[in-house]
Amino acid sequence: VYKPGALKAFKLGGHSSAFGASTSVGAGLTYAADNGFATSVTVNSKGGSGNAGILTAEDESKINTQVAYTADQYHLSVTYSKQQNGWDAWSYYATTDAASDSSIDSADAYAFRAWWRPQETGSTLPSVSLGYDVISFDGHDLARNASGYMVGLNWQDTFQPDDRIGLAGGSALAIDTHVLGASDLEEMDPFLWEAYYSFRPNDSIEVTPAIFGGSNVEADKEDDLFGGVITTTFKF
């Protein structure tokens, strides 16, 4: 439900262990029951354009399996992701140490997502989106596992129809457990946030001024940041 205002990190309930925004060869199957339950399986491959082939022992690939329940005002889902031969889409939003060895043998990831929204827009209550990810590595030089999270709030139709206020915060994938011999490495807690207001001057234009920032973003040094951006979308 949360719609990001500036940062890719807050897409998909957190751009993290199981999901990615890059493109690759893939296929998927979805079954949705009338009672709100749904399940899906997707397969992605990066070897289709090379010599590795698709879904071979050498293919850089990922298989996601998701179970979800959606009602009018809330949603719950869990996704299991099996990744092999250096699948590294997760490393885009990870700390320096966690992403330092993206050519891992394999990884098992779990992504938990939930959202709730009020019955009507224009309420003082925001919609709430939560995401938590954990990933375990086989063959990583530094990490046994890592985790990250996000929380996103949206208020709609607050000052005028079709406007949106957004506020989100979260952490990139950061190492929880180091491999033997790398335990002396200490990561600082990373944190990233954004705030924005989106409105429509008319039916064809949407304007979104946003500010964003973070502390210890890469977790290996005090690398804080702060910035702002104005996005204007035209539809004809």
Describe each PLM feature range.
Residues 1-63, 94-98, 177-179:
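Surface-exposed coil loops of outer-membrane beta-barrel proteins
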Residues 27-31, 65-69, 78, 112-116, ...:
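Residues on the lipid-exposed face of transmembrane beta-strands in outer-membrane beta-barrel proteins
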